[in-house]
């Protein structure tokens, strides 16, 4: 049986208060506290370079920290706009590319809100768009991460 892992999503205020500024220092800091997981946040866009991601990934491996990554928050899988969905697929692909040097095994993707759509229509769109994303990940050979859908906290 796999042991549960605990850790933060992103760097907390206590990380900065301890004098740290770089995410590559997070794995050692987390390990010192007995934590075993770290979710790299791309909530406002994928803004981490490959060199930095490699450093974070190497530090995570060295300290036994399991990595995950969070795709940008502005993704909305219930969208009916084809241009918007093309962008959403692009955001997920960017996130998946960054997951590789980070060594992330899971990629969290927000489903977004239903807006003025009925719940049924929003779910149908989301299912279709998730299939499109999975197809794009497969076509781009970016299948090393499990896609984890995260819902909003309403009804």
Question: Where do the PLM segments sit?
Answer:
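N-terminal pre-domain/capping segments
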Residues: 1-71, 75-96
């Amino acid at each position: 049986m796999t042991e549960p892992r605990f850790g933060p999503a992103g760097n907390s205020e206590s990380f900065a208060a301890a004098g740290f500024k770089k995410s590559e220092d997070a794995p050692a800091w987390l390990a010192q506290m007995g934590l075993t997981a770290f979710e790299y946040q791309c909530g406002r866009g994928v803004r981490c370079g490959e060199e930095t991601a490699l450093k974070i990934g190497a530090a995570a491996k060295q300290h036994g920290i399991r990595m995950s990554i969070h795709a940008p928050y502005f993704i909305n899988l219930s969208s009916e706009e084809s241009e918007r969905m093309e962008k959403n697929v692009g955001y997920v692909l960017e996130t998946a590319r960054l997951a590789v040097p980070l060594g992330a095994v899971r990629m969290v993707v927000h489903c977004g809100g239903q807006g003025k759509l009925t719940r049924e229509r929003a779910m149908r769109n989301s299912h279709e768009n998730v299939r499109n994303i999975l197809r794009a990940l497969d076509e781009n050979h970016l299948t090393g991460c499990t896609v984890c859908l995260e819902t909003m906290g309403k009804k």
